[in-house]
Amino acid sequence: MNNNGGLGFTPQTSVNKTIYVEIKPDSLMVRRVGEQDSARIIKADEEGNLEQGYRVRTLEMGPNKGTKVAEEIYNVLSKVQLVKAFSEEKFGQRRMILVFNNMLDDSPNIHVQCTLINDYNSVNGYASSLIDRIPNIKIGKTMDFSTWKMTDKNTGKDRRGITIYQENEKLQSAYYDYVKMERIGDKPSAKKVKKLGKETWDFTPVAEYQLGKFEEFSKALDDY
């Protein structure tokens, strides 16, 4: 036997994996179940025995329209660190990707994604909610991250956003004074414009500002 001076090889028995979830319009963070478990969960749903933490829905669009799919559902990430944030083009849509990890040994990265730019050329509600809190986020500190949806009693419109706690403190938007109930900071407002004889709102200045802040934050995370 060769004397290698203590140098040896230990096989790696565990492999870090990545878990992908998507924030849906109903505020749930959803992970599609693999084919092996999907049939079992769909059958349980049909028998009225669906386990907590799962749901079954029927696809309404695309080539698989009408097909039932099983999904794991979540609404919170606890004691995690945001380690990366970036955007990507997917199926003709610009999306925001947030990568979380609880920083424990062999813990998987959690990729949370949602629409970044919507059909109105403005920033999606969940992405906008995060971006407006960026100035108050402490990079390298753990956080609790959750998603929500509510209906505005005055307008009847749905509002969506995220809630972040760091060091037991709820992070607020950096662009609103919640005591004086007024806007603050240099974030621009949407402009009312006339198109084809109709008045509408142009969110371009807001979107450009928020995208700039998101890109700065993305670089800051990479440099940390």
Task: Describe the residue ranges of each PLM region.
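Short, structured beta-strand/loop micro-motifs enriched in basic residues and often containing a Trp
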Residues: 119-129
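OB-fold ssDNA-binding interfaces and closely related basic DNA-contact patches used
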Residues: 1-115, 128-135, 150-197, 203-223
